Amino acid sequence: MWMSLRRLAAVVFTSLALTGAAFAGDGVGARGPVYDITHFDVLPVTSPFDSEQIAYAALFKYRDASESDSGSESFRVVNWLLAPNHSQIIDVWRSLDAFEAHLAQSHSVEFRLAVQVQPPPPPPAFNCCIGSPIDDRQYSLVKSFNMPWTSNLLPSGVGLKNSALFVVTYIDFLADGDPGKGQDDLVRYGSDSSKVSGQLSFTVLQQLDRPNRFATLEVWDTETDYNAWQNDPKTNKFLAKVMPLLGSPLDHRLNILCGETYVDGTGCVPP
C-alpha cells in the first residue's frame, strides 16, 4: 500500500485503523517483520529558511526517538548519492502491530508536522520543508543472504569517505505476468550476489499489498565492488531473464549512511 503520511495528529489514529484492515484483506500476509521504506525529498532552499537543515535535524531526532519504540529492530537513514537532498528511511519492525503503534507515537506525528506543508489554519504561511509528500511502502521479508539488514554488525561509518554502499532497488513485475517467477529469479540472484567479494548483506522484500512489487536492500563494502558485480556475466544473465517480466525498469538507488550531521549540497557527513 502507498501509505501517504500527510495527516495531522487528529487523523493519524483513524488512518492506522484503516491501514490494518486493508492489510488484513491483502494477498501478502503481514506476519513476521515489517520493512518500511520511506522516501524523503527535501527542497534545497535556504531562503526564507534553510529547509535542509530544518528537515534533517527533525529526521535525525525522529530516528533517535523511534529506536526506543517497542518492536523496533532497525532504523537507518541513507542518503542518495545522485541527489543529496533525497534520502530514504528504512525502518524494520517486529510486526505490523508494532509498526502501527510506532506511527501513533507523538514523535512520529511531530516529525511529519515539522517537515510537511499543512493545510491552514494554522499556520497558513508555513511552507517547509519537503518537495513531495512523505510516502512509505511496507514490505515482508522474502529471503536474506549474508548478514541480516537488521544486524548491528553491518558497517556504521557515515559520509562519503567512511560509509559502506547501501543500495535500494525497486522491482515492479507485471501484475498479469509471472511475479512468482520473478521472485524466484530475484532470490537466485541474491544467492549469487552473496558469494561475491565485498558483498555484506542482500535482502529480498515483497510489498505487502502489491505482491508483484519487490525491493532489494544491499550493503557493499565499496562502490567499486558493487560496480564490478553489475558488469559481471551473472548479472547480465539475471537482467536478461527478468526484463520480459518487468512493468518498469529496475530503479537502483545508491546511498551512503547518515549519522547526525547534514551539510547543504553535500549530504550526510561525519560529525
Predicted regions: what is each one?
Residues M1-L5:
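N-terminal secretory signal peptides that target proteins for export/translocation
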Residues A9-G20:
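Bacterial N-terminal signal peptides
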Residues A22-A24, A30:
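Boundary at the C-terminal end of the N-terminal hydrophobic targeting segment
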Residues P33-D41, R76-Q105, L165-D172, T203-D232, ...:
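Short, well-ordered beta-strand segments in beta-rich or mixed alpha/beta enzyme
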Residues D41-A57, D172-Q183:
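Short, surface-exposed ligand-recognition loops at beta-strand->loop->(often short) alpha-helix junctions
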Residues K61-R76, V92-Q138, D192-L200, V219-I256:
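An amphipathic, aromatic/His-enriched active-site/gating alpha helix that lines ligand/cofactor pockets
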Residues P124-F173:
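Surface-exposed beta-loop interaction hotspot
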Residues N152-L208:
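Surface-exposed interaction/gating patches
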